[in-house]
Amino acid sequence: MSSYSYTVAETQTFSVTHARHMAAKVATDLRRMQRFYGYPSDADIEAYEEELVVFLKAGYLGEVSYGFQKNNNWIEPTLRYTAGDLLGSGTDDDPGKIRPGKDVSGASFYSFMTYSSKYLNATQSEKDTALKDLPFKRVGAQSPGINGYLENDKTYSAGGRSLTRTSVRNFV
């Protein structure tokens, strides 16, 4: 009786093209949110997309959320994207499926980002070099809570990395 085994090693280099591909999908989600809810502005969407390209390319993104906040809590519609390494062949979903008609009266549009362990372990010089092209600087803030729950609904991937999208949903 014979047995055979083999190993396949696959390496991919994550490029700015891969980062742009994934960031463009997030920008499309934000444009759909804008169409239904009036925010974010075109200029903000462009800046968020540029920021995301820089953070994805550097490997410095942990999570980023875009959406509406009321009483220091995210409400529906809010989208959270979590960066990770792609395991296996992965999925690269089409953007979209933003639910229309949610009540955002009295809420403010907001974005919040957390950083990866690679960012936290980088030297200041490495951070300065990687982040020199950011369109704006974020300031420290407390992470908002969630009024509802998070539902995994999309995965965007390219070049061996992924962004998993979760959406805030109401308990109703």
Swiss-Prot record:
It holds the Pfam family bacHORMA_1. Transmembrane segments: none annotated. GO terms for biological process: defense response to virus. Keywords: Antiviral defense. Residues 141-172 are annotated as: Required for binding to CdnC and to confer phage immunity. It comes from the Bacteria. The keyword GTP-binding does not apply. Changing residue 35 to A: Binds to CdnC. Sensor protein of a CBASS antivirus system. CBASS (cyclic oligonucleotide-based antiphage signaling system) provides immunity against bacteriophage. The CD-NTase protein synthesizes cyclic nucleotides in response to infection; these serve as specific second messenger signals. The signals activate a diverse range of effectors, leading to bacterial cell death and thus abortive phage infection. A type III-C(AAA) CBASS system. Binds to a closure peptide (consensus His-Xaa-Xaa-Ile-Leu-Leu-Thr), which allows it to activate CdnC for second messenger synthesis. In the disassembly complex (PDB:6P8V) Cap6 (also called Trip13) crystallizes as a right-handed spiral; the top 4 subunits bind ATP while the bottom 2 do not. A CdnC monomer lies along the surface of the hexamer at the interface of subunits 5 and 6, with Cap7 (this protein) at its tip, over the central hexamer pore. The N-terminus of Cap7 extends into the pore, contacting 5/6 Cap6 subunits. Forms complexes with CdnC with 1:1 and 2:2 stoichimetry, and a 1:1:6 CdnC:Cap7:Cap6 complex. Belongs to the bacterial HORMA family. HORMA1 subfamily. This is CD-NTase-associated protein 7. It comes from Escherichia coli (strain MS 115-1).
